[in-house]
Amino acid sequence: YSIILIFIFLNTSCIAQVESNKDWQLLIPSEGLDGWHYYQDKKSSKTGWSNENGILIFNSSFKKGNRDNSLVTDKKFSSFKIYFEWKVSTGGNSGFMWGVNEDNKYTHPFSTGPEIQILDITYSNGTIPHPKHSAGALYDLIAPEKNVNKKAGEWNSFLITIDHIKNYGEVIHNGTIVSKFKLSGDSWDEMVKNSKFSNLDDKSFSHGDFGKFKTG
């Protein structure tokens, strides 16, 4: 089984404003999962996530429910900066997605949402993951410029910028800029074309909408 721990701050005023503490909002309550729900499951029939002292914890041994047990914010966001710290157990594998649409025609968050990878450095029985699948990667699209991932059980930090006005995305992993990318346009289309997501148009679960939603 795997365990993932996360705590999160979000800044939604990153566009043309000076950042200050008042711009940031804490997304995780001191207890419970208020403000969050399981993907396509607002009735909370799924399990696996818990909140311990303001830290979100996923324990796969407690997972129940069919299909995807990803956790989704109740609020929808478009352009933002998000800061969070995370650590995983040995073999842990997770990720942060944006632009996720929960229409029932999409069976998984990755049908629509691009992902910044969260991964144990020794994932897959100690073998080194594909660079585009390593921690800090824009999953299967861009490998991080530098591997700064820490060992399982140690805290990592992400500061992720998604700015649709400037058409700009950025990942800072443990204080180091590891990737920059466009969110749409020719360069984005080319990345998708050369990835596993290029075939999603032919699959019933995707409907060809990967990376198409600016709000989610």
Where are each of the predicted segments found?
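Bacterial Sec-dependent N-terminal signal peptides
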Residues: 1-19
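Carbohydrate-interacting regions of secretory-pathway proteins
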Residues: 14-216
